[in-house]
Amino acid sequence: MRTPPLILVVDDNPANVEILQMRLAANNYDIITAMDGESGLAVARERQPDLILLDIMMPRMDGLEVCRHLKEDPSLPFMPIILVTAKAESKDVVAGLEAGGDEYLTKPLDHAALVARVKSMLRIKSLHDRVLDQSAQLELQLKTATKIQSLFWPDIPQLEEGSHIWALSVPASYVGGDLYDIIPLPDESLLVYVADVSDKGVPAALIMAALSAKIRSAARIQTDVDRLLESVNNSLHRLISEEGFFATIVIVRYWPKSGKMQFSIGGHFQPLWIVESGIGDFSQAKGVSLGISPGMHYEKKEILLSPGESILLYTDGVIEAENERNELYGYDRMVGYIKNSKGPPWGQGLTEEIGKWRGNAIANDDLTLLEIWRD
């Protein structure tokens, strides 16, 4: 809002305009005027005042029509409108407010009431503009946070011996709580994982950053996936348990040359093992989510990924994606897509399929996929 505020007075009676000018100028407001509805609408669009005093009964275009035009124009900023009229019946007041008026004054104007209404509307205008500025600053900060979070996503390495890896994470908002990482180990194996923090937005993103750092730090000392989760769980519990947060995770150690794969799970979905005949069956690895309780133990399972097979890690944003009819994408639909599609790989195509299925529905959760496959 300007300092001093700019007020537009629209009235077809020169005497009324002069009186309003004198009373408002005495309170150190800048005043501009218009003598009918059409010119008032044009001046409001051009000058975008901080407040409009608008007469209702005017030739060519009455005040209610001017009000509707201004309130329905999305390109204009918020400009509070005080409707000024001799009509004082309740139906007239209702009609004015329904047209978009923010306040109502009846003629003849009481000076004290006029000044009080003007100050009240300008306070609302000031608060509105302040909130708008804060919202713009927050959006800029969130965009910066999005860029920073994208730095956590690792480069996708080129593997040897016919092995390949691909990953994608799409936050539901500017930043999210999903996480994946690909960590090369000295023995030429890879440590990869997909994790999901039990929240969304900025808190989840901050926990995600802490979890990423703790896993990378622990991996320098411990590469057995079960014991690594035990270590990370203990340190994460000290960090987030009081706030009620936790994280689910599936972590895999993969040897590209042989296809050997070891994995452990903390409260997460089992990996999807895609074999020639469909979905492979293997015993589940048990383990609770990270951060809930210290001293937990995690199971380690092992499979051999043969040529033509794939392992798919995913978060709940995949199977819980909703379409415009509030239907969940679901596990069965995901498996059906894989069985009816050519692969490997399947991850990229599955992501596109979910996008088409969702349509114009707003994403309600972060979505992350990581796939390892062999030619």
What does each model-identified segment do?
Residues 132-311, 359-375:
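… and, occasionally, acidic/histidine-rich disordered N-termini of signaling adaptors
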